[in-house]
């Protein structure tokens, strides 16, 4: 498939994932024919597939998202193993968010930011405006009560945002995006986890060589040894991969 406005779907554990060849393909897909798609973007890695397997609510949230894409190298390798002809590459969520913001700045697309600490959010806004002239029409840090959610949704709707990015971690961000779409459906939503922290330099990402080798997970483990328990869960995913139970 060579049409940049289209992309094949590949199923892993019953979830259809978009197969993007590279970042350019992803952007052309999301901005097909000059029209930004509407729906929810969810980055899929091995850990998220495991969580979806064990938690029906998380699985339902992920399944309902229109645009599920391979964020983790293990997921990319599983797609290639199950579908040998697949032309799919890893599109890291943090990189996709930056590319999306750059494109939004170029086209004047209105953006609303949710999540993060107040100081991190303020720095994110300032850097986006300085770096790409992003049209930020509103923001809300991650410190709000359940009772304040509806007011936030109303603010997002009133802002006219066409892109809403939510940095609250999974599954909180997926829950918020699902509920916000009931009030403001005509936008592209993206859950971005800790991306604002990385973007503003508060958290160091793995060097490019580690990323290119598909070893970003190992860098994070070496930097944060307490992640070992989370990483041990991935042995189950490896069993799926090597036994073909995908």
From Swiss-Prot:
Domain of life where this protein originates: Bacteria
- Protein's UniProt keywords contain Acetylation: no
**Listed GO MF terms:** lipopolysaccharide N-acetylmannosaminouronosyltransferase activity
- Give, as in the UniProt entry, the pathway in which the protein acts: Bacterial outer membrane biogenesis; enterobacterial common antigen biosynthesis
Q: What class of enzyme is it?
A: transferase
Pfam families recorded: Glyco_tran_WecG
Q: What's its catalytic activity?
A: UDP-N-acetyl-alpha-D-mannosaminouronate + N-acetyl-alpha-D-glucosaminyl-di-trans,octa-cis-undecaprenyl diphosphate = beta-D-ManNAcA-(1->4)-alpha-D-GlcNAc-di-trans,octa-cis-undecaprenyl diphosphate + UDP + H(+)
Q: What keywords sit in the KW lines?
A: Glycosyltransferase, Transferase
Known EC number: 2.4.1.180
* GO terms for biological process, alphabetical: enterobacterial common antigen biosynthetic process
Q: Give the similarity note.
A: Belongs to the glycosyltransferase 26 family.
Per the entry, what this protein does is:
Catalyzes the synthesis of Und-PP-GlcNAc-ManNAcA (Lipid II), the second lipid-linked intermediate involved in enterobacterial common antigen (ECA) synthesis.
Q: Identify this protein by name.
A: UDP-N-acetyl-D-mannosaminuronic acid transferase
Species per Swiss-Prot/TrEMBL record:
Salmonella schwarzengrund (strain CVM19633)
